[in-house]
Amino acid sequence: MTITVDIEIEDEAWTTAEADAEALVWRAAQAVLDAHEDIEGQGIVILLTDDDSVQALNRDFRKKDYATNVLSFPSPPNPEGQIGDIALAYGVCAREAAEQGKPLAHHLQHLVAHGVLHLLGYDHERDDEAEAMEALEREILAGLDVPDPYASDEEGR
């Protein structure tokens, strides 16, 4: 089944900072989908927006009144329906990339892969879940020539 990836750019800061942001998002999402052949659903919507919009979504749906890098909203399982929606906050993502000393393009692809995995049911609440999800992220990102996003985290552990 072909799954569509619709990308909506609400904050032009994304394309100002990263001219090929839409292509990067599509490649990262598609890499996750390609690694999962048994997906049921028609599509994913990915919104590239600003911190205020993500803060409002986080407050309204998660009761957490702050902006975060990425939010994933899985849809109820339905082979004929959407898999879910993802929203990414430009300011938070750009700040994190700068603080971590990595290109915004790499951080964006990581967060898209992370968000799509959440839509597919992956989580990181428990250590074993986090390890499995991070391993899958590393594998997918390696295929996109994105360095291990957790390398510096592990050095500090």
Swiss-Prot record:
InterPro entries: MetalPrtase_cat_dom_sf_prd, YbeY, YbeY_CS. It is found in: Cytoplasm. Keywords: Cytoplasm, Endonuclease, Hydrolase, Metal-binding, Nuclease, Ribosome biogenesis, rRNA processing, Zinc. One of its GO terms (molecular function) is metalloendopeptidase activity. It is an enzyme of class 3 (hydrolase). Binds 1 zinc ion. PROSITE patterns: UPF0054. Zn(2+) binds at residues 114, 118, 124. Its EC number is 3.1.-.-. Pfam families: YbeY (PF02130). The keyword Nuclease applies. Its cofactor is Zn(2+). GO terms for cellular component: cytoplasm. GO terms for biological process: rRNA processing. The keyword Zinc-finger does not apply. Single strand-specific metallo-endoribonuclease involved in late-stage 70S ribosome quality control and in maturation of the 3' terminus of the 16S rRNA. Belongs to the endoribonuclease YbeY family. This is Endoribonuclease YbeY. The lineage of its organism: Bacteria, Pseudomonadati, Pseudomonadota, Alphaproteobacteria, Caulobacterales. The gene is ybeY.
